[in-house]
Amino acid sequence: MEFYPVAIEKLIEEFAKLPSIGKKTAQRLALHILNLPNDEVREFATALVKARGTIKYCSTCGNFTDTDPCALCSNPNRDKSTICVVEQPKDIMTMEKVKEFNGLYHVLHGNISPMQGRGPQDIKIRELVARMNEEAKEVILATNPNIEGEATAMYIAKVLKPLDVKVTRIAAGIPVGGDLEYADEVTLSKALEGRKEI
């Protein structure tokens, strides 16, 4: 039996639709919103509606943007010879935090996952191939180091093989500060595979 009015239950239900938000967290968020002053609730709602109405995908790379092309694609200081392929726009934010990559990006908006019913035609691989031109010299595959990410990387490498472009995969391995004792066999294998000369 629920103890909240229908409007609160609906708010909880909507928050629970968000990724990684369970019923308890959704309840806390809903109750927090209800305890905010009206002007803060209006600001929150306005920001949500404005973001949904103005943010779109960059027609070049697929990143979130409010201009087209996005700030990264239109930046003349970016290295146009290197394209880093990621699964989601949030992965670009993660890569940019590292401040080690100065090339362009390509967002697949997913991965190949037969178990989820997603094939190569369901993600932005055709668009990646269309971006291969005289300027593109290297494609870095930075898909997630899981079964779907590996399958996606292997498929893209196969598709790009006939083209005159170098295809590399980011190394996977032991995290900094991690202990070998806790690493699984696949992680250790990838760490050995991706080793560099020092």
UniProtKB/Swiss-Prot annotation:
GO MF annotation: an example: zinc ion binding
Domain of life: Bacteria
Database matches in InterPro entries: DNA_Rcmb_RecR, Rcmb_RecR, Rcmb_RecR_Znf, TOPRIM_dom, TOPRIM_RecR
Database matches in PROSITE patterns: RECR, TOPRIM
GO biological process entries: DNA recombination; DNA repair
ZnF endpoints (C4-type): 58-73
Keyword vocabulary terms for this entry: DNA damage, DNA recombination, DNA repair, Metal-binding, Zinc, Zinc-finger
Ranges where the Toprim domain occurs: 81-175
Entry's family note: Belongs to the RecR family.
Function: May play a role in DNA repair. It seems to be involved in an RecBC-independent recombinational process of DNA repair. It may act with RecF and RecO.
Annotated protein name in UniProt: Recombination protein RecR
